[in-house]
Amino acid sequence: MRKKAISRILALVVPVLLSLNSQAFATSVQDESPVTGSAVEAVHTVPSTVAAPVAGHAEAAAGQAAKAEEKPGDLIMHHILDNSTFSFEPFGEVHLPHLEVAGFDISITKHVVMIWLAAILLVVIASAAGASVKKMSANQAPKGVANVFESLVDFISNDVAKPNIGHGYEKFLPYLLTVFFFILVCNLLGLIPYGATATGNINVTLTLSVFTFVITQFSAFKAQGVKGYLQHLTAGTHWALWIIMVPIEILGQFTKPFALTIRLFANMTAGHIIILSLFFISFILKSYIVAVAVSIPFAIFIYLLELFVAFLQAYVFTMLSALFIGLATAHSDSHDGHELEATARHGDGLTV
């Protein structure tokens, strides 16, 4: 009889206790976030030697939840924008040092690292190609990297610098070759996994354009003199129109480097956005069929197109730089000057 009475009491009490416990748990879940509530309970109910690891796991879980909730757009911008962190998912991250001198932030960023890497690669490749050419006999053709390097040098020299600058193009050739190979290597490094595109940073493209602008203006003063330079601003018009023509010509001098800056920056940035967007289509739609049939093939196609664009943009920037230098150093008589002017305007209309 006693056993039956005890079993009846337990049968009545246990469901009540379970219901009260479930209600209390539901109330705590509504009042607190899951991670914070569990972390607080762990700290208050377990010894201090166990509380710290539990709290650490709670923070790690919160960080993983935040990453999981990160939107594809945020991930794309994180890949494109410059920062001090190299992300090597799933292996971890490398944080670059923060440097500040006299209140100026001169921290090393991933684009700075890629610029250094591009410079080192250019020095190594050019040195190896030069050493290979020196070892060959006069009748022997270059091979491998030396052959590719020599072909590109001949192309910039004979098909870019010489026709656009004309007489005296040799003194501008070192700058044009440096700009071409630097932009090309930076563009290609941006296509490597875990890499970054330095030419997708408007500060980098602006600096390159400023170099071209300074060389162009200095060459114009040297070739034409102050008088000839000022006469070029008036463009042979009547003095009554100078108030209109001079501001337009001065503005035109600054629109050229601006066009160089935006063209290179926009093209290199747009290509990476398209590639990443195509990859994220499969994640957004949560479909393996879309990934296999649409997302991955189109991303590979755009990636191959970016290889072509890497060469094309290096060529366009170098060609327009040579064109602006040739326009600045052209003799004012002439048919050559007008022809270069027309070609420059046509070049400013390029959208590739």
From Swiss-Prot:
Record-annotated membrane-spanning stretches: 112-132, 172-192, 195-215, 232-252, 264-284, 289-309, 310-330
Protein's name according to its UniProt entry: ATP synthase subunit a 2
NCBIfam families: ATP_synt_6_or_A (TIGR01131), PRK13419.1 (NF009953)
Primary location class: membrane
KW Iron (keyword) present: no
Keyword terms, alphabetized: ATP synthesis, Cell inner membrane, Cell membrane, CF(0), Hydrogen ion transport, Ion transport, Membrane, Signal, Transmembrane, Transmembrane helix, Transport
Record organism: Chlorobaculum tepidum (strain ATCC 49652 / DSM 12025 / NBRC 103806 / TLS) (Chlorobium tepidum)
Similarity comment: Belongs to the ATPase A chain family.
Family annotation (SUPFAM superfamilies): F1F0 ATP synthase subunit A
Entry function: Key component of the proton channel; it plays a direct role in the translocation of protons across the membrane.
Region forming the signal peptide: 1-26
Molecular function, one GO term: proton-transporting ATP synthase activity, rotational mechanism
Protein's membrane topology: Multi-pass membrane protein
Location of this chain's protein in the cell: Cell inner membrane
Lineage: Bacteria, Pseudomonadati, Chlorobiota, Chlorobiia, Chlorobiales
A Pfam family it matches: ATP-synt_A
